[in-house]
């Protein structure tokens, strides 16, 4: 099965960002992609770089016109879309990703682990996610999501693997020359859980902050299953064979050889 990561920048014009995303979905679908993922908070500029209450106006409800545009694109192109966005839900705000399956909202993941770092003031804007770690049953396979910092906490990906995920999308908004760190972390998660993990990173300049892209898909043997992207807008293609996942799981047996009775300290 062919999947794609849409590595793109996002500016202050939300409508333009939406239109660009929809356009790139069509191109990815023409290339044969059946599942298409986007970077973290892909519809907005990188507002968490500082604390600014006026930026809450950038949030969208799941029922908003912006999200509906991607629902329509999912129907038109008959694809599954993993769309990260700034979510407004009643009086709470989340760093979220909606999974759209050929026009159907398959579900929503809300980022669990929120950094509070220079240029990443996420705890000011977002409530920690309350969705736990769902696996979305779609027409193109079982999909999990771990948003940016979530991927540096291995428990989430392990839960997704235990619950039957075939693919984990890892949308990020990474800068500051951290590519080597992310390549190691994502590849290790893919290998330790014998599944596919697609890291889709943001690109572009945003108020002095540079996002470097370099998106890639790691496979269940710890290998690269896509070309490593550059630092410009791009569509990254990966061709997956689920037999590879099954073979890796059978060979290494990480999940079936676990010893949960010995892991009590991890939740203290």
Regions found by a protein language model. Give the residues of each.
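Active-site catalytic loop in hydrolytic enzyme cores
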Residues: 60, 88-163, 175-184, 250-252, ...
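Extreme N-terminal starter segment of soluble prokaryotic enzymes
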Residues: 1-4
């Amino acid at each position: 099965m062919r999947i794609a990561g849409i590595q793109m920048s996002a500016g202050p014009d939300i409508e333009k960002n939406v239109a660009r995303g929809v356009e790139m979905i069509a191109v990815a679908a023409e290339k044969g992609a059946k599942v298409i993922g986007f970077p973290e908070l892909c519809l907005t500029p990188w507002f968490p770089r500082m604390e600014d209450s006026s930026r809450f106006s950038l949030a969208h409800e799941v029922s908003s016109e912006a999200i509906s545009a991607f629902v329509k694109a999912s129907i038109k192109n008959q694809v599954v879309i993993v769309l990260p966005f700034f979510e407004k839900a009643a009086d709470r705000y989340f760093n979220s990703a909606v999974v759209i399956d050929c026009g159907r909202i398959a579900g929503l993941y809300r980022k669990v682990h929120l950094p509070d770092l220079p240029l990443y003031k996420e705890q000011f804007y977002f409530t920690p996610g309350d969705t736990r770690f769902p696996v979305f049953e779609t027409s193109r396979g079982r999909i999990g999501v771990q948003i940016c910092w979530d991927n540096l906490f291995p428990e989430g990906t392990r839960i997704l693997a235990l619950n039957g995920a075939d693919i984990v999308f890892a949308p990020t908004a990474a800068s500051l020359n951290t590519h080597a760190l992310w390549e190691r972390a994502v590849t290790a998660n893919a290998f330790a859980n014998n599944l596919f993990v697609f890291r889709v990173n943001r690109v572009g300049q945003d108020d002095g902050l540079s996002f470097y892209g370099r998106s890639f898909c790691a496979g269940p043997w710890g290998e690269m299953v896509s070309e490593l992207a550059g630092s410009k807008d791009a569509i990254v293609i990966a061709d997956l064979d689920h037999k590879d996942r099954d073979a890796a799981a059978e060979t290494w047996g990480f999940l079936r050889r676990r010893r949960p009775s010995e892991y009590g300290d991890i939740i203290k």
